[in-house]
Amino acid sequence: MYLKHLHLRQFRNYRDQQVKFDGAKTILLGDNAQGKSNLLESVELLSTLKSHRAIRDRDLILDSKQASKIQASLERQLGNIDLALTLRSQGKRTVAVNGETISRHLDFLSILNVVHFSSLDLDLVRGGPEVRRYWLDRLLVQLEPVYAHILLQYNQVLRQRNALLKKIRQQKMAAETTGSSPSILTQELALWDAQLATTGSRVIRRRQRLLQKLAPLAGEWHCAISGSMEVFKMEYLANVIVDSNELIIQDSLEGVRQAFLEKIKVRAIAEQYQGTTVVGPHRDDVIFTINDTPARQYGSQGQQRTLVLALKLAELQLIEEVVQEPPLLLLDDVLAELDLHRQNQLLEAISNRFQTLITTTHLGCFDGQWLQDTQILSVKSGNISSFLDF
């Protein structure tokens, strides 16, 4: 797939900017806070409908404007596709494909596949479990768009169940009736238990399936980057039961669901006391080890960077294998975080195989020959022009 054209209107610090991409490699050159990362963010939004930098749509809109629009022309094997995303400070966002508004956002996902790599991705190793869960979920949405609906269902059930647990906790603390007897609340909780186990087991199974595909690819890349000096492993740590991973490997959805219900029973008193759900994939984690040692606690900075680079290259490879087209690669000021060896490994892996958009403040980290067939654009205060014009 190839991104041919991008049009940003009132998005972040871009008032009305069009960009034509002329080759497989494009460098966005400029000082910090000029809009380089904003452009990559717009491409990420077209891919996943999510931004890792903002939660509210109004934070993505220029100044005090009411709306912003991102449009793109994309070339895929099946033909050319025009994408459009309209964000509003008040009201719902809308998406369109080839000029036709799409009511189901699910149908918009995965039309444009991207892998985003920034310095923040180092948190994949050293950050908390929520960072790794978000990484898995974002990748899964690109590979299986229906997963967005599965995850939404689980989160809706989780919110409802937490609200009920909070009521039960308040009732116990008050030690008085509140219009509903404890038995009625308990009966209602049992209904939410069943829904939580059903939706949660689907999330667990898909995450584990993803890791089974991703782990060997990441291991190969890690071996290549480290010179076969280290052994890298990754494992999905489900909190349902200790041996739940074996059930998942056996692809036993019902087995995982039953294990889920059993764990809920075991933690029932703790949940009612705390007033929140402590069982489920929202508490799961991914464990990375190097030579059987946890990378998060004991990995050096160099080892952690090698690990993340291997994961990102594995993402590229997996998406290409599943989608049967190479995804776009977005490199957001990440080369400055890598030493010369890792920079060369990354740039060599990219070559002209993946269309790549790179942000940087200087060109010193690029080989002169690598730059020969690279489009270089200058970014300054939300305005983009050819570097040759400066």
UniProtKB/Swiss-Prot annotation:
Matching InterPro entries: DNA-binding_RecF, DNA-binding_RecF_CS, P-loop_NTPase, RecF/RecN/SMC_N, RecF_2
GO molecular function, one term: single-stranded DNA binding
Gene Ontology BP, a term: DNA replication
Annotated signal peptide: none
GO CC annotations on file: cytoplasm
Disulfide bond positions: none
Keyword annotations: ATP-binding, Cytoplasm, DNA damage, DNA repair, DNA replication, DNA-binding, Nucleotide-binding, SOS response
Binding positions for ATP per the UniProt entry: G30, D31, N32, A33, Q34, G35, K36, S37
Subcellular location: Cytoplasm
Predominant place of localization: cytoplasm
Keyword Secreted: no
Family under the similarity heading: Belongs to the RecF family.
Purpose of the protein: The RecF protein is involved in DNA metabolism; it is required for DNA replication and normal SOS inducibility. RecF binds preferentially to single-stranded, linear DNA. It also seems to bind ATP.
NCBIfam families: recf
Protein name (database record): DNA replication and repair protein RecF
Organism of origin: Trichodesmium erythraeum (strain IMS101)
Lineage, opening ranks: Bacteria, Bacillati, Cyanobacteriota, Cyanophyceae, Oscillatoriophycideae
Gene designation per UniProt: recF
